[in-house]
Regions:
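Short acidic, gly/pro-rich beta-turn/loop elements at beta-sheet edges
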Residues: 8, 47-48, 117, 138-139, ...
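A short C-terminal boundary segment appended to hydrolase-like catalytic domains
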Residues: 134-152
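CN hydrolase (nitrilase-like) catalytic-core segments centered on the catalytic cysteine
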Residues: 43-127
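Short loop segments at secondary-structure junctions
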Residues: 31-32, 112-114, 131-134
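Short, well-ordered beta-strand micro-motif
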Residues: 27-29, 109, 128-130
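Active-site catalytic loop in hydrolytic enzyme cores
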Residues: 1-53, 66-75, 142-145
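Active-site/binding-pocket entry motifs
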Residues: 3-4, 65, 95, 135
């Protein structure tokens, strides 16, 4: 939905030059549970996930730059898992692209409590983790934060 713009010392990016912003949040019901979908830069906008309502897992495929990824990637993903009390699955491109752009990588899976269940720091590979809907229910029962929200 959101288009990335970054001006660093040695690099700058403006996705609006080549991409079009999305229209709205996306979630779908599956046999696993309710899944929310977003892309990369969207992870910086918590109001997007509030607009989606309650979901069991969030998928955030990304291509974070090295400077923004090193500083913010894991923190943002763990925060989204904790505040939504849902799994976060974040496949991430990493390495040097033909254009010279370098992306951060660090694909990971995080549980609803914010614990990192699996991570692939760099290079090609697969991240696997057990994801259990009972864990989502357990976390929400132990800390019913969404029931205590006063702003909607």
């Amino acid at each position: 939905m959101h288009l990335f713009r970054f001006e660093g010392r040695d690099e700058r990016h403006d996705e609006s030059r080549t991409l079009q912003a999305g229209d709205g949040p996306v979630a779908l019901a599956t046999p696993f549970g309710r899944l929310a979908l977003s892309v990369c830069y969207d992870v910086r906008f918590p109001e997007l996930y509030r607009a989606l309502g309650e979901f069991d897992a969030l998928f955030v495929p990304s291509a974070f730059t090295v400077p923004t990824g090193a500083a913010h990637w894991e923190t943002l993903l763990r925060t989204r898992a904790i505040e939504n009390q849902a799994y976060v699955v974040a496949p991430a491109q990493g390495g040097l692209h033909p254009t010279g752009r370098r992306t951060y990588g660090h694909s990971m899976i995080i549980d609803p409590w914010g614990d990192v269940l699996g991570v692939r720091p760099e290079g090609e590979g697969i991240v696997l983790a057990d994801m259990d809907l009972e864990r989502v229910r357990e976390v929400r029962a132990r800390l019913p934060a969404n029931l205590n929200r006063r702003l909607h």
